[in-house]
């Protein structure tokens, strides 16, 4: 027959210590300082990326704010970003930060200029293309981006129902404007 007496005494002693510690905490004799939440402060989603049949929402700082089962219609989709994993409530660690920076700059300009752009694609060589309806908008590299987006706002309503390619990579000769080729 095994002796259980010492084990029971140890368990009882531990229980008494736990009760004493809880009493000291509850009465305020011992104060516990809790570590603040280390997750980033999440803000309103401004874009989304598609990932494993889900639509992951991103804020302006590339924090993943949530996920949806269907594609949002009020914010643009961002494509061209490379990453290993995605965790809701965490910052999206991209392999090419400059590509992500340019993509989010375009997203910011889309919102500032109240444009209805469906998708923003930035390639590894940092050239951007945006899509809306049947229009492909070639933005090129991050050069005069804010000015280009402001120009787009000025004539967006005139072209948004068309089908073709709007080349905004640079102004045409003699600064007459951007070129548009219908399909």
Locations of regions flagged by a protein language model:
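Charged, solvent-exposed interaction patches on well-folded alpha/beta domains
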Residues: 2-183
């Amino acid at each position: 027959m095994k002796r259980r007496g010492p084990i029971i005494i140890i368990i009882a002693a531990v229980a008494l210590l736990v009760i004493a510690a809880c009493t000291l905490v509850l009465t305020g004799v011992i104060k516990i300082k809790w570590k603040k939440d280390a997750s980033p402060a999440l803000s309103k989603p401004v874009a989304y990326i598609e990932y494993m049949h889900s639509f992951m929402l991103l804020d302006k700082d590339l924090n993943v704010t949530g996920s949806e089962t269907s594609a949002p219609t009020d914010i643009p989709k961002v494509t061209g970003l490379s990453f290993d994993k995605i965790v809701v409530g965490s910052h999206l660690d991209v392999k090419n930060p400059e590509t992500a920076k340019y993509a989010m700059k375009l997203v910011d300009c889309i919102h500032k200029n109240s444009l209805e752009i469906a998708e923003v694609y930035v390639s590894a060589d940092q050239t951007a293309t945006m899509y809306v309806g049947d229009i492909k908008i070639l933005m090129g590299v991050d050069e005069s981006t804010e000015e280009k987006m402001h120009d787009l706002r000025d004539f967006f309503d005139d072209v948004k129902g068309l089908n073709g390619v709007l080349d905004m990579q640079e102004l045409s000769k003699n600064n007459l404007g951007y070129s548009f080729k219908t399909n």
